Swiss-Prot record:
Gene (UniProt): CYTH4
Domain PH residue range list: 259-375
Alphabetized UniProt keyword annotations: Cell membrane, Coiled coil, Guanine-nucleotide releasing factor, Lipid-binding, Membrane
SUPFAM superfamilies in UniProt: PH domain-like, Sec7 domain
Designated name of the protein: Cytohesin-4
Swiss-Prot/TrEMBL GO biological process terms: regulation of ARF protein signal transduction
Length: 394
């Protein structure tokens, strides 16, 4: 006899009914368990589907962010437009400013380019960007370190003026009573930037002493002098540690050449035995770069244009020539560098650079562009103008 399942004849009618009821409940329970399994499987399927969709959405967003950053680093205005169109940014100037302030994946030079434009939106973003900085209880050098690290200062005088004016206003707002006017903060900021260059640029031989720094800043505090101990602290801070200027993202020069002033093939006279070699020239950021091939990431040579002049010149072997030279130091080597055959960076040996174009028109266009690029460092003119403004108030 099966002890687990007794024969119906052995059970009473009541026991038979109880057995049937148990079997029915067991069947219902198994069905309920199966329903729960099906529902759980459905929930997990929905979760998997949601996670897959979320991952896909996040992957798409990350892809769009990457594209937007690349666009911004090549053309800041188009990059911001792309971010807004893809709802990665709102058109609100505060939102744009915070995005630039965080700067994730953004080129600091491109940030400076965008902030320097005169478009009303850009001016509002500049103000909001400066307001992102907290300068309270920082001395001026500390504040400048923070500010000048957040973007790369452009080269045009008007852009620098607007940016430093906004900085001076913000600093004085965060530190009331330190200076008598924003003009004082503005002038002293430029004095510190120029001091940084004079103390740490290897090409500057004359290192200014503290006394000269004091003399530079006499009368800038609405006609009176700033406390000497205040100037001493600022001087010592810069002397012990130069400003950290943002390097181009990616540690290469690639992005520098996205929007050059001029580029093209030219012939350059050089070498121990003077020969003409075809080189790809790029004019940008007050420098003339030349490459062996257009696809090269690193230039064969770099010619800083500061203090140089350019002129047409006749050459017996090549037509349409121009010459780069130093008008105040004829016969001396021009400050420049190049890579030698072993790939080492060495100092250039040219007293002048002779370059040949393919036509008179092309030569004249290069001369015009180079002359436009050869500019004085604008800081001195800006400081001089502001000092005159301070003096006129006395």
């Amino acid at each position: 006899m099966d002890l687990c399942h007794p024969e119906p004849a052995e059970l009473s009618s009541g026991e038979t009914e109880e057995l049937q009821r148990i079997k029915w409940h067991r069947k219902q329970l198994l069905e309920d368990i199966q329903k729960l399994k099906d529902e759980i499987a459905d929930v997990f399927a929905q979760i998997d589907c949601f996670e897959s969709a979320e991952e896909s959405r996040m992957a798409q967003k990350e892809k769009e962010l990457c594209i937007g950053r690349k666009k911004f680093n090549m053309d800041p205005a188009k990059g911001i437009q792309y971010f807004i169109e893809h709802k990665l940014l709102t058109p609100d100037v505060q939102d744009i400013a915070r995005f630039l302030y965080k700067g994730e994946g953004l080129n600091k030079t491109a940030i400076g380019t965008y902030l320097g434009e005169r478009d009303p939106i850009n001016l509002q973003v500049l103000q909001a960007f400066v307001d992102c900085h907290e300068f309270a209880n920082l001395n001026l050098v500390q504040a400048l370190r923070q500010f000048l690290w957040s973007f790369r200062l452009p080269g045009e005088a008007q852009k620098i003026d607007r940016m430093m004016e906004a900085f001076a206003t913000r600093y004085c707002l965060c530190n009331p009573g330190v200076f008598q006017s924003t003009d004082t903060c503005y002038v002293l900021s430029f004095s510190i930037i120029m001091l940084n260059t004079s103390l740490h640029n290897p090409n500057v031989r004359d290192r200014p002493p503290f006394e000269r720094f004091v003399s530079m800043n006499r009368g800038i505090n609405n006609g009176s002098d700033l406390p000497e101990d205040q100037l001493r602290n600022l001087f010592d801070s810069i002397k012990s540690e130069p400003f950290s200027i943002p390097e181009d993202d990616g540690n290469d020069l690639t992005h520098t050449f996205f929007n050059p002033d001029r580029e093209g093939w030219l012939l350059k006279l050089g070498g121990r035995v003077k020969t003409w070699k075809r080189r790809w020239f790029i004019l940008t950021d007050n420098c003339l770069y030349y490459f062996e091939f257009t696809t090269d990431k690193e230039p064969r040579g770099i010619i800083p244009l500061e203090n140089l002049s350019v002129q047409k010149v006749d050459d017996p072997k090549k037509p349409f020539c121009l010459e780069l030279y130093n008008p105040s130091c004829r016969g001396q080597k021009i400050k420049a560098c190049k890579t030698d055959g072993d790939g080492r960076v060495v100092e250039g040996k040219h007293e002048s650079y002779r370059i040949s174009a393919t036509s008179a028109e092309e030569r004249d266009q290069w001369i015009e562009s180079i002359r436009a690029s050869i500019t004085r460092v604008p800081f001195y003119d800006l400081v001089s103008t502001r000092k005159k403004k301070i003096a006129s108030k006395q």
